[in-house]
């Protein structure tokens, strides 16, 4: 499977940075899974959009893709997240898409020590 992850990552992070919860959720498969850094798993667009709506109501960090690597239907993205307090926090997102190009699984990792 050949998939344009560069385009998908741009769309995903543009939606995140605009605080567009519905736009983010639309990128997921109906039964997509979001795995948070603490291991919590959210399944289905309804649960995922509610999570992003909650996050968007708060002061949202601003992630930027530093680099990514894709292979088939999977992609690993190294992120640098600008936090509301001005610090920068390394993170990584691991995506898997289905045959329709929708996110079927996203696992988020966050480094607990901000960069200086």
Model regions: which residues?
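Short, low-complexity N-terminal intrinsically disordered segments enriched in polar/charged residues
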Residues: 1-30, 115
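A beta-strand edge to alpha-helix "cap/lid" segment located at domain peripheries
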Residues: 4, 13, 35, 49-116
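Low-complexity, compositionally biased segments
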Residues: 7, 20-23, 41, 96, ...
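Short, flexible segments with low predicted structural confidence
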Residues: 19-20, 40-41, 67-68, 74
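A short gly/proline-enriched turn/hairpin at secondary-structure junctions
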Residues: 33-42
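Alpha-helix N-cap/helix-start motif
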Residues: 41-45, 88
């Amino acid at each position: 499977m050949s998939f344009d992850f560069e385009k998908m990552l741009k769309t995903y992070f543009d939606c995140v940075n605009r605080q567009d919860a519905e736009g983010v959720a639309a990128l997921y498969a109906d039964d997509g899974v979001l795995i948070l850094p603490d291991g919590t798993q959210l399944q289905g667009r309804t649960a995922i959009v509610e999570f992003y709506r909650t996050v968007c109501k708060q002061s949202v960090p601003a992630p930027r893709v530093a680099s990514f690597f894709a292979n088939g239907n999977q992609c690993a993205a190294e992120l640098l997240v600008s936090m509301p307090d001005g610090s920068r926090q390394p993170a990584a997102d691991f995506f898997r898409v289905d045959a329709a190009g929708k996110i079927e699984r996203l696992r988020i990792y966050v480094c607990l020590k901000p960069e200086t």
